[in-house]
């Protein structure tokens, strides 16, 4: 039986893990449709093409047979037309492919194989540590799922940071220790400079011709090969790991990276596996006496949140994308793309996303999605914006993060409450100064709570907000509600 191995642009796993006979051809394709069904950030498209071509080169250097369609070869032809041509030409009867994480593409791929009577073999994905089956077993028949419970299970399963099956340091999470504001004058380490892929100029031309109306500036600043991401990780360990935990939630008006590893896009492309990242981080921490709150916080992001989000998506993604718990209907305007809303922290976060396709998780959760949610933006609009604006976006990433964590649009499948805040939290965690924007954000916050009073008053954890709302000075309340309404009218449709 003639076999074809298909490798997608987010399955660029280290060559050592490919486990394939060199007689079996490998199919890869750059595809205009996959770049444009959502207007992906220009730097994201550049990263994908750079990483895919670099991976193609590595495969060929290791004597694998690669069938590669680049942007100069039938670029406008659909992905499945290209695949069909190779299947038919080579009389392929079976396709091997790693598990496809994004459900819409997985559905299309299964339909292609069924229509063309091709056997398909899904291989376990090195992109994750836990299996889909194991996560489903964790879910059981419960209706609500706590990330903290899953994280404990993963720590025990992997025997990480344990002593006599109990957490080192006496607790599972040091999150409460990781909420420090950056001290005045703190010197933030610079990210390493990455050498662009050798064909980056050609890739840039493709993007400028075909995707000129997509958001974002066009840069090559992220690793596009295994060798580069290993070096990137080592520099993170050396320069930023030690104080990563302390300032994990800090916001800086001029800086979008602070001490974060910025590994998400590389992990989501498959350039490095989470298992390797965990192993290297544990080894480095032991040798260099990294504080436990930094090590634990870093590990929790990978084996806690990342694995958990993937599992939630696989089991609840279809339900989430049809959910709109708050019945929000407002639409975004151009101000949310060019950073001209008038709320300074929001505009700086937007401009960071425009420039880099990246900003860290607190900007994403407590500024971007928070303010969008407070403005009653339709969660489908928010999902689309996050998919467009971030270099690490994928359906499996953004569906749970937007519909679940960011907006509570799913009604609480795994989030214990809506993550919303007024200006006081932003001021406490950042170096932004008080200004007119504070009245707008505070108005949006209290207006949201008043409009959803029935929800908040029935939740023991949240009913305090209603009591605080009732104590607002009437003149203050009138002023900030006017500010909020004017803002919503200005920046939504």
Q: What residue spans do the PLM features occupy?
A:
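Beta-rich, aromatic/charged-enriched effector core domains that present basic-aromatic interfaces
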Residues: 78-222, 403
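Active-site-proximal binding-pocket segments
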Residues: 262, 267, 272-440
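Long, charge-rich alpha-helical interaction segments
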Residues: 442-444
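Hydrophobic/aromatic-rich, well-ordered segments within soluble, folded domains that form packed cores
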Residues: 47-67, 96-97, 357-380
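Short His-Asn-centered micro-motif
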Residues: 6-10, 29-30, 69-71, 97-100, ...
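Glycine/tryptophan-enriched, flexible segments
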Residues: 158-298, 448-451, 456-493
